[in-house]
Regions:
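Active-site lining segments of carbohydrate-active enzymes
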Residues: 1-9
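Catalytic cores of carbohydrate-active enzymes
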Residues: 7, 17-121, 125-127, 170, ...
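Long alpha-helical scaffolds in large eukaryotic adaptor/regulatory proteins
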Residues: 25, 29-36, 156-159, 163, ...
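C-terminal substrate/ligand-recognition segments
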Residues: 119-164, 213-217
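Terminal, non-catalytic domain-edge segments
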Residues: 206-225
Length: 225
């Protein structure tokens, strides 16, 4: 078969996860006196990974490329770059994180989640309707995903701290009505990427519910700081 959304080579969120894992294990080992040498080695690898990450993915417009495969650069603005600004360990500095978050705010954010691709990108298809094949081609090409917004809002809170609380709270309001429209107390799988942002797919999606609960916990944490 053919992939609906082909992505090959160096993929931005895979490399973000790799850096995060290297740093996490390095700090974990640093607490063990007998593993300090391995901890230092992993920290060194992470440092090289961070430099390579920035050289590979950060473009002159201030956001991250989705993937790089040899000479093929995918300039699509996708939410996959947000993980690099939301994880505990990031290969980006504060200015670089802000660039990705600002792009996501302008191009991807909706009242019902984060779009899977920017409307200005080729192949944008915001409506999850029609037969299976048609819906498959819309799945990651413009529909909005609440679970991805959880990572976006976490990145926003990391950047702006307490000053971000009111913004995050306003984003959460968009889900209140949805909890009584489809499955009581739950959020549907995804939403159309354009107004009126109609809920689609499964009537209850655990990843979305979990991210909303996690975001509410993050709000409480920052509110108490």
């Amino acid at each position: 078969g053919r992939p609906v959304t082909p992505r090959s080579g160096d993929i931005v969120e895979f490399n973000t996860l790799w850096y995060n894992a290297l740093m996490y294990v390095s700090e974990l080992l640093a607490e063990n006196e007998g593993a300090s040498e391995l901890s230092s080695r992993l920290a060194g690898i992470a440092e090289k990974t961070a430099k390579s990450f920035v050289d590979t993915f950060l473009n002159e417009y201030g956001y991250l490329l989705d993937y790089v495969d040899g000479d093929m650069l995918d300039w699509s603005v996708r939410p996959n770059m947000i993980f690099a600004a939301s994880f505990d360990y990031s290969p980006l500095d504060a200015k670089q994180k802000k660039g990705s978050v600002d792009f996501a705010t302008r191009e991807l954010l909706t009242p019902k989640g984060v779009r899977s691709v920017c409307p200005k990108s080729g192949g944008y298809n915001p409506n999850y309707v029609g037969p299976q094949l048609q819906r498959d081609y819309a799945y990651h090409q413009g529909t909005a995903w609440p679970w991805l917004e959880g990572f976006y809002l976490e990145a926003y809170l990391r950047l702006y701290k307490r000053s971000a609380i009111s913004f995050v709270e306003r984003q959460m309001i968009g889900y209140e009505d949805e909890m009584s429209l489809h499955c009581l107390g739950a959020i549907p799988e995804l939403f159309d990427g354009n107004p009126p942002f109609k809920g689609r797919g499964a009537v209850s999606f655990a990843m979305n519910v979990a991210q909303i609960l996690r975001t509410l916990n993050l709000l409480e944490k920052y509110d108490n700081q």
